[in-house]
Amino acid sequence: MSLLVEIEKQLGNFHLNVRFQAETETLALLGASGCGKSMTLKCIAGIMTPDRGRIVLNGRVLFDSEARIDLPPQQRRVGYLFQNYALFPTMTVEKNILCGIRSGSKAEKNAALTATLHRFRLEGLEKRYPAQLSGGQQQRVALARILVYEPDVIMLDEPFSALDYYLKEQLQFQVREVLRGYTGDVLMVSHSRDEVYRFCEKSIILNRGQVAMKGETRAIFQKPENVTAARLTGCKNFSRIRRIGEYEVEALDWGLTFQTEEAVAAEHAYIGIRAHQFYPARGSANEFTCEWGDTLCQPFEWDVLLRPVENAGAAGDKENALEREVIWWKVDYKQSDSLNQYQRGDRVRLGIAPGDIMLLKEG
């Protein structure tokens, strides 16, 4: 099973230009709103037509601008789960699912329907209409309709965005179990790094219609190449840098100097530091003084906003600090007891390990 996508599409001022290949895997398209994720899926499904390029699925050409091939959606064998599930509102659950069964006698279709209702735990809901179902039930019906269609590729467009939080994680386990039994390619569009990390072996980072980075999902999270990839994988702290030495940089937006574990190359324009990787100073490398700012309490951690202070204790210190970019520090509640002493304006010393400083390209 394989999917090759090499397409361009101009829509107003937006230019989509993506090239990637999937080989029997679950592949994520991760990016901010408006970066071209859903547009890419619509081009593959035949809902939108690229201006140029090729789309090939398991050796079948779905689209080729030069050869003037553009198969209609019903001939592409693409299963597309829309954000709103796109169930037929005037059809019952069983009729929605039967729409996906392409061939077979009436008895064979009914047997397939019965098996599908059992597999997706929809027994007892056969005669209900979509409006009478919960969000999770609607999603299961939509997935059931896709699977009985036996598509060559399944595309999930923000599959959990319409669900309440308490249902989301439960349904993620159910969807993952369904996909384990599927032998084709799966494309998943999401802006949620948690969903991408849980579901997808490989990821493509999209930025303004372009591929910013692609590779193994875990590798991208551990070592993003550029600012876009780092931001989309959850990094909150960025600073422009000036190279001081092979393993030393000045963080221009913070007025701080850091030692790095990775050699600093000419292409590196920024550093990124994940918010949970700072620690209270303990007499090691890369320690600095900050001014305590706002604190946001979450159920299991604190978010602390800090401003770096250069030359702690010097006159004019406060004015210098106010000009610097803030640093986000995420603190587990298990560590928070020792931090209760701090109030807004207090000084605190933090550290960061050289190996936790990410050297990033621009873009």
Regions found by a protein language model. Give the residues of each.
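Non-catalytic connector elements of ABC transporters
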Residues: 5-32, 38-39, 46-49, 60, ...
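C-terminal boundary and immediately downstream tail of ABC-type ATPase nucleotide-binding domains
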Residues: 222-245, 272
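ABC ATPase nucleotide-binding domain helices that frame the ATP-binding cleft
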Residues: 38-41, 141
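Short switch/coupling loops within ABC ATPase nucleotide-binding domains
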Residues: 42-45, 80, 84-92, 98, ...
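Conserved ABC transporter NBD signature motif
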Residues: 53-65
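ABC ATPase nucleotide-binding domains
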Residues: 77-79, 92-228
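ABC nucleotide-binding domain signature
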Residues: 27-28, 70-72, 76-86, 187
